[in-house]
Amino acid sequence: MSGSTAIGLTTEVISIITFILVIAIFVIEIVSCVTMMTLKAITLKKRLSFCQGCGKNASLVILPCKNKVCMECALKMRCPVCYEACLWCENPDGSLSSLALINKERNKVRDNLPEP
């Protein structure tokens, strides 16, 4: 015969409720862990992108020929993979940039720097 607790439930009922709660928490932890590992794998894949021109691990832009290169390789105005002339690139945020304009601005800043 089973004993009764102060709140009127038998110990079997309390043990069943505890078992169900433990199983539910375990399932929630597994789902949380799988979700976290999936997100980590996706972001790691994006972080480990290397330039197709020089091999540097840098912030990459996408050229019109769909090759991913660093900004230094893109500013040469020619794709280092397929050797197509490139006039613009797609930034990581999806916006488009004119490579000629970026080159012009960088040259202007470089020319205005005083000699040490």
Swiss-Prot record:
The keyword Endoplasmic reticulum does not apply. The chain crosses the membrane at residues 13-33. It is found in: Host membrane. The keyword Cell membrane does not apply. One of its GO terms (cellular component) is host cell membrane. Its main location: host cell. It is a single-pass membrane protein. Keywords: Host membrane, Membrane, Transmembrane, Transmembrane helix. This is Putative membrane protein. It comes from Alethinophid 1 reptarenavirus (isolate AlRrV1/Boa/USA/BC/2009).
